[in-house]
A protein has these predicted regions:
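Conserved small-residue packing positions in alpha-helical repeats and bundles
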Residues: 38-39
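Solenoid-repeat scaffolds in large eukaryotic assemblies
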Residues: 49-50, 57
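Long, charged low-complexity segments
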Residues: 73-128
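Helix-loop junctions and short alpha-helical segments
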Residues: 1-28
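Accessory, solvent-exposed terminal regions and/or long lumenal/extracellular loops of proteins
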Residues: 31-34
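Alpha-helical junction/boundary sensor with strong preference for TPR arrays
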Residues: 60-61, 99
Length: 128
């Protein structure tokens, strides 16, 4: 019934967006590519590539979603991301030294990544 149709619509909505982007009917923001890339690297244990990409992914998320919603939670998450930028720059620079991953790096990546993912999910849900 209606519940089944609603669940199917919720499941396929991201696919519709992907199809529109591929078909040239819609444009994706850089953060929509970068944030999932960081997640894929982190989940696969590629901590250094994730650490190198996270700062620019978070910066893109802030810039590209700043004015997209008037929502207190959205603004609080963007403030959290913005305040994380100095630490993400340090992380990026440390990852560039070539010394490999360090203890706790995965958790350092996970926290701001989860906030950025939440920002993108919220924007997707509230702008449709």
């Amino acid at each position: 019934g209606d519940d089944t149709r609603r669940r199917r619509t919720e499941r396929t909505r991201p696919l519709e967006r992907i199809a529109a982007i591929i078909g040239g009917k819609d444009e994706a923001d850089a953060c929509e590519f970068l944030i999932p890339r960081v997640r894929a690297d982190l989940d696969a244990g590629r901590l250094i590539p994730a650490a190198l990409t996270l700062e620019v992914a978070v910066r893109a998320t802030i810039v590209e979603t700043d004015m997209s919603l008037e929502d207190g939670d959205h603004e609080a998450d963007l403030d959290t991301l913005e305040s994380s930028l100095p630490a993400l720059e340090v992380m990026r620079d440390r990852a560039l030294t070539g010394d490999g991953a360090w203890e706790g790096l995965g958790a350092e990546i996970e926290a701001p990544l989860a906030v950025a993912e939440r920002v993108l999910r919220r924007r997707r849900v509230l702008t449709q």
